[in-house]
Amino acid sequence: MGDYFKGFAVKVLADVDVNKLSSNQHEFNGSRAFRELLGTPHGKKYLPTRMAYLDDDLEELPELFETFLTWYDARESNAARGPEFRLLYRAEADHIINRAAAGDTLFLAEEENGNLILVIAKKGSTILRQLQWVFDVQHTDDVLFVATDMGMQAPREEIASEELLALLGIDVDLTDDGLLDSILRRFGEKLWPSTPEFSAYARSVVKHADPVRDPDGTLMQWVGMEHRMFRTLEKYRISESIADGFLDAEGVVDVEGFLKLSLSVHNRRKARAGLSLEEHISTILKTNDISFVKKTKTEGKKEPDFLFPSKAAYGDLGFPSQFLTMLGSKTSLKDRWRQVLNEANRIPQKHLLTLQPAISEDQTAEMQAENLRLVIPRALHGAGFTPAQQGWLLGLDDFILEVRAREIAGTHLEQAVLA
């Protein structure tokens, strides 16, 4: 976080902050404490600010609203009285502030250039838990928390924090020019290598991974390496397209061509992220001698990502369902976790692996009520989850042990029947 911000403040909003009937007009209360972040103003300081309100209904990256905050001492000209610092927002930002309610949380971050980012996250939401995770703030009961020593912030997994920083308008550069030559040598003139071959190459680059002793750490290493390698190749390929320009034969700007390129980048990223995660999970399962089948149909068009131990066992109604397992995989969830609930009717408890680093208690309670169990790499089990949630989560190592035990029990049953 220190690469992007000089400091930040986190404030749980009170009624006086958001209720026009009881608030100081367009002012965030508790402004004295903001001085630790913003410094002592001399005269009025007009701070360029990008703002947004975030909740779990968000489907795409929000368009941050550009405005100004005013930071000043209302008593600067009155030396006989103590300072009265005020942080004001303009009426043009009312459409954002009016969505907020008491109990929501405000995040105010100062970029290296002195500009501010202000986002408000809905109380009890998953996006709030994710922002608390990425800022390393678990002081959820504090009215106001300020951090200016960014060197003290705990490091975060790059691939997990990238999407969250994008919500704040921060472009995280995960490219590595040192990898480009080896990628181009390996794939030659192939524009976009297939996901299976690119994933396999990424795994070959990672040294000291142990998918048997440390499947959780190995998955994070492989996914992280492929993500970095793909972004490096993507930057190279897109730079080529941009260098060619977006002018048609008559020299007119080809807007449609530009939009087509932008959309293709967006779609390719989404598609490859999910497919590459499946590739790495498959390799870990195979290395651990776990029997499974990928993307096989169960009922009708239902097609779980992973089915254990086999399609034949699933289709054999004499094979006990307690020895069957299914696993879905999604890099992030939102409400898409519900999609796996209707897959594989014979299996009452569903499993879903995700790389999402934080989830609200309300959402995990819904998952438990629907008999869904999350599998999350252990590196992500920490600050984004409460102790109660952590006790419920499975690591990938836990999941492998569970599936292996069911496979052994099912094999013993089949042998007993044959005997």
Named regions from a protein language model:
Residues 93, 267-275, 326-330:
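Short, charged/polar micro-motifs that form catalytic or ligand-binding hotspots
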